[in-house]
Amino acid sequence: LLYIDDGSKDGTVREVKKLIEQDSRVHIVSFSRNFGKEAAMFAGLEKSKGDYVVMMDVDLQDPPSLLPEMFEWIWQGYDSVATRRVTRKGEPPIRSFFARRFYHLMKQISQTEMMDGARDYRLMTRQMVDAILSMREYNRFTKGIFGWVGFKTKWLEYENVERAKGETKWNFWKLLVYSLDGITAFSTAPLLIASFVGVLFCI
């Protein structure tokens, strides 16, 4: 069990170290500051050693009860079992609106599959994890990378669950920047638009 602490200041590291004293199978990677979700996920995958790897948030918005079913699909030959929310219960309406618009836009301009409501909660084989780690992008957009590497994936749906404790650090500006990273990383549309505008100014 590997915890990734993204520069928290709420005593998380102290509590995890207590767990480590009780169980040697528990480990932690603690960042010196907040580097963001993408860096945390990459560090977790890089430090993982098992034949199968599960990524999940610790706020319990990713239901652990799905794990048995996820492994059943892996035994049936899937390389990855991914999850998506079919509702956005408890989420601000404006955030839900822009999230839906983002996924709709990506379907139009990108050749890489990105499911609406996709979560980072996912079970993967070691082969898929290694493929993801081989991509050393500086500005990572893991939701796109999952689709780009092309492994056989089963999708499980569930209704959104409100976080058990705490508040999200993702404000509108951070979500906008993250969305722009996804658009520029997995679509040629921005480049084509820039080229077209450049040609117009040269005429």
Where are these regions (language model features)?
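Short beta-strand/loop segment that forms part of the nucleotide-sugar
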Residues: 1-8, 29-30
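A conserved acidic beta->alpha catalytic loop
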Residues: 5-13, 60-61
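A generic structural signal for short, well-ordered alpha-helical segments in conserved domains
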Residues: 13, 17-20
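Acceptor/aglycone-binding surface of glycosyltransferases and processive sugar-polymer synthases
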Residues: 18, 25, 29-33, 37-47, ...
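Glycine-centered tight turns that cap/initiate beta-strands
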Residues: 22-25, 152
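Hydrophobic helical membrane-anchoring modules
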Residues: 141-203
